[in-house]
Amino acid sequence: MLKSRGIIKGINLGGWMSQCDYSRERLDNFVKENDIKQIADWGFDHVRLPIDYNIVQNNDGSVIEDGYNRIDKVVELCRKYGLKLVIDLHKTAGFSFDFGEPESGFFDNKEYQERFYILWEEIARRYGHDTDNIVFELLNEVTDEAFIGKWNEISDICIGRIRKIAPEVIILLGSYHNNAADTVQFLNAPHDDRVVYNFHCYEPLKFTHQGATWTPDIIPGERMKFEDSETSEAYFEELFSTAISTAEKYGTTLYCGEYGVIDVVSAEDSLKWFKVINKVFSKHGISRECGITRKWTSAFPTASTTATVRDTEVSVIKTRKAHNCCTLTEVFTRVY
């Protein structure tokens, strides 16, 4: 479904309209036209734009036109440089995947849920007609298993309301445990044939997150070489097996919306991991979005940059730490 629309390999624009300080300086300058051109020149076919609800919606549910004007500019630049666009709602009123955010209550609060529906109806009115170029990602990384029942209900209602406005737009839908692949099986059957199951992959965690200080599952001082990890084609085949079978059962496809490796891993070992996981993605026709983007305070690298990607990106691994550590040439010409 996504491949037929030219959406196969993408890159994340995190830290711009989400996970940020919302300052005008950040919103005006974090990503510029040349950055979008560079992404296209690297050979990517789409970008993922995470947005937080407060970019486009006031607390009373009313529209913030400045936020939509900014999204309009991204749409225009993507069209100019031949890129497709995934609009990802990274945070909604009452919920964020980031436990450090002061958002809670979404799954039990009808007012928050109505704001979620209204927000997506507005996005659908503005962008839902451009079905060849724009995809909607309903919500980033539902966390707790306890939420899945209500999330199935909420997402189905929301998709139904979107469909009254934008009947043909593709919608990405993820499950709990932060869009884990093995929880796709607990999603309801797709609302219709234009819903794609979405998952994220940072596995095996002890390899991709080695040195991380934000998860109790990792001892920060421990290091692991690629050869000492579980990583293999067979490992990912098993990890993705229930997601693949669930998608096949319901006649839909899969999208991996985030994946990568932390910066302490060598470029060589990172490249090995990317090559293995991308081989499995390609085998099963899974489109994907690599979580590479720019550093918080500096510009995108040029094609001749000799620094590693870890020096020029922002993370989407929970804490804004960089994570894909190959050289630019390796990442953009070899891992895909």
Swiss-Prot record:
GO CC terms of this entry: cell surface; extracellular region
Annotated active site: 141 (proton donor)
The organism's place on the tree of life at top rank: Bacteria
GO molecular function: beta-glucosidase activity
Keyword line: Carbohydrate metabolism, Cellulose degradation, Glycosidase, Hydrolase, Polysaccharide degradation, Secreted
Main location, first listed in the record: secreted
UniProt cross-references to Gene3D superfamilies, sorted A to Z: Glycosidases
Pfam families xref list: Cellulase
InterPro entries tied to this protein: Glyco_hydro_5, Glyco_hydro_5_CS, Glycoside_hydrolase_SF, Glycosyl_hydrolase_5
Enzyme Commission numbers on file: 3.2.1.-
Subcellular location: Secreted
SUPFAM superfamilies to which the protein is assigned, alphabetical: (Trans)glycosidases
GO biological process: cellulose catabolic process
Function description: Crystalline cellulose degradation.
Protein family: Belongs to the glycosyl hydrolase 5 (cellulase A) family.
PANTHER family: ENDOGLUCANASE, PUTATIVE (AFU_ORTHOLOGUE AFUA_5G01830)-RELATED (PTHR31297:SF41), GLUCAN ENDO-1,6-BETA-GLUCOSIDASE B (PTHR31297)
Protein name: Cellodextrinase A
The organism of origin for this protein: Ruminococcus flavefaciens
